[in-house]
A protein has these predicted regions:
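Ligand-binding pockets and gating/stacking loops
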Residues: 1-448
């Protein structure tokens, strides 16, 4: 198979709302901070609260655009042809569980997966769907394109970054790009993701701020100096209440140490993997992102978000799934789960496969399916999750929930709970307003 770096650079052009990368990256005035600044801010301001955090990391694979549940996870062979589509159910490794024949690879690892077929919410546009599924909370009334500000809820990765224990690597990393609604909101940019901004499937893949630069641009150097001046001002003010804040110079040294650290450099250096292992994942963007994510959690990253795009199949749904989307997805997911298991990491690594909504039961005149948040499917594995089960059910037309509705809040509460973070604890905005991590959801008890 061929390298697919071009896929990620144009990942939004196929979405019906036409979001652009600049809009997504505008998550705060300090959104351009580099690794040293992130390390400084995370260590200076991290205040873990609640019950002790478990040693469980999370790989959060988000299928941007909206996966068609009835063509993948929740096949309806007895529905009319205009609903059931062109795919058929196949038996899987888990007794009694069937999925689509477009996912033969995933059918071999369903014993590790818990498939939730009754996820539901009410937001049918991409921006609002991104937000509710990434944060567990609706963004409020009005149009929303996925570009968070301090009035919105922080995403799961930022919650984990804020409440987890800092390690040698940034606690929240996004690959290959920034995920819609994947920002920290009122928690502040120190808890935002370290974004790779490069496709690990590319032959020349490398990660910024990990390799020592030969030169630093004038603008970037000026920005760092401005941050340092602001830190010095803050240090002087902080002396009246304590000496918990240290010089940013220390964190530049730490970042430089990370650049020269064998462990850190190896974690980001996907080229150290054998050709056989890379081929097992597939030399595609999603395949190599999954492999890189395994390397990152193995090295101590708490939360890795994977952007997997182009699922907005308004046209040619069957062709898009069969020839473009599912082959790479269906290769990457079982490779990741099997690799984690073989390395003894699956019990300590929660893998979440999510999306912003499902697709309409009725196939449209363009042979595609449109947005449908009424019911859809997500899946989880590892991290204490009992595999080989289906939770909830859609109706016979895959149009609504028939049993056990699951909300985005439930999903968010579940991930936090599995990672040992109390989902109902209270955080405060910079103005002192109390905000619960999850105010409308509870952990999905059937998973454990």
């Amino acid at each position: 198979m061929t390298h697919s770096s071009a896929r990620t650079t144009s990942r939004l052009s196929s979405y019906c709302d036409g979001l652009n990368r600049r809009e997504m990256l505008s998550v705060g005035s300090l959104g351009g901070l580099g690794l040293a600044e992130l390390l400084w801010m995370q260590e200076s301001f991290a205040k873990a609260k609640g019950k002790p955090v478990r040693d469980i990391n999370c790989i959060f694979l988000f299928a941007l655009g909206g996966q068609p549940h009835q063509d993948m996870w929740d096949v309806k062979p007895d529905a009319p042809s205009e609903i059931r589509g062109d795919f058929n159910p196949i038996s899987t490794k888990a007794s009694g569980i069937q999925i689509s024949d477009v996912l033969p690879g995933i059918s071999t690892v369903t014993d590790k997966l818990a498939i939730m077929r009754s996820v539901t919410h009410v937001d049918s546009d991409h921006g609002r769907g991104y937000h509710v599924m990434m944060t567990g909370k609706r963004p409020g009334a009005g149009d929303f394109n996925g570009n968070q500000n301090n009035n919105h809820h922080p995403c799961l990765g930022s919650m984990v970054s804020r409440l987890g224990t800092p390690g040698e690597l940034p606690p929240y990393i996004s690959v290959p790009n920034f995920l819609n609604s994947g920002g920290p909101s009122f928690l502040g940019p120190s808890y935002g993701p370290f974004v790779i901004e490069a496709d690990p499937a590319a032959p020349d893949f490398s990660v910024r701020d990990i390799t020592l630069p030969t030169a630093i641009s004038t603008n970037r150097n000026a920005r760092r100096q401005a941050v340092l001046r602001e830190i010095n001002r803050f240090e002087r003010q902080a002396e009246t209440v304590g000496r918990s804040v240290r010089s940013l110079d220390t964190f530049y040294q730490k970042a430089a140490g990370l650049m020269t650290s064998k462990k850190a450099k190896e974690a980001f250096d996907i080229h150290r993997e054998s050709d056989k292992t890379r081929a097992e994942y597939g030399m595609t963007s999603v395949g190599q992102c999954c492999l890189l994510s395994r390397r990152l959690v193995e090295a101590g990253c708490r939360f890795v978000a994977i952007e997997n795009g182009h699922w907005d199949t308004h046209r040619k749904n069957t062709y898009s799934l069969k020839d473009l989307l599912c082959p790479s997805f269906d290769r990457a997911v079982p490779a990741l789960l099997n690799d984690l298991e073989q390395r003894g990491m699956l019990d300590d690594t929660l893998v979440v496969i999510s999306t912003e909504f499902g697709r309409t039961p009725q196939i449209n005149q363009l042979a595609g399916r449109d947005h449908w948040p009424n019911v859809f499917s997500i899946a989880m594995a590892g991290g204490g999750v009992k595999g080989g089960q289906v939770i909830g059910a859609s109706d016979r037309r895959a149009a609504g929930v028939a049993d056990r509705p699951i909300t985005p809040g439930d999903m968010t509460a579940t991930v936090l709970d599995l990672m040992g973070i109390d989902p109902h604890q209270i955080l405060h905005t910079p103005l002192g307003r109390p905000i619960p991590l999850v105010d409308d959801g509870r952990p999905i008890t059937e998973l454990t």
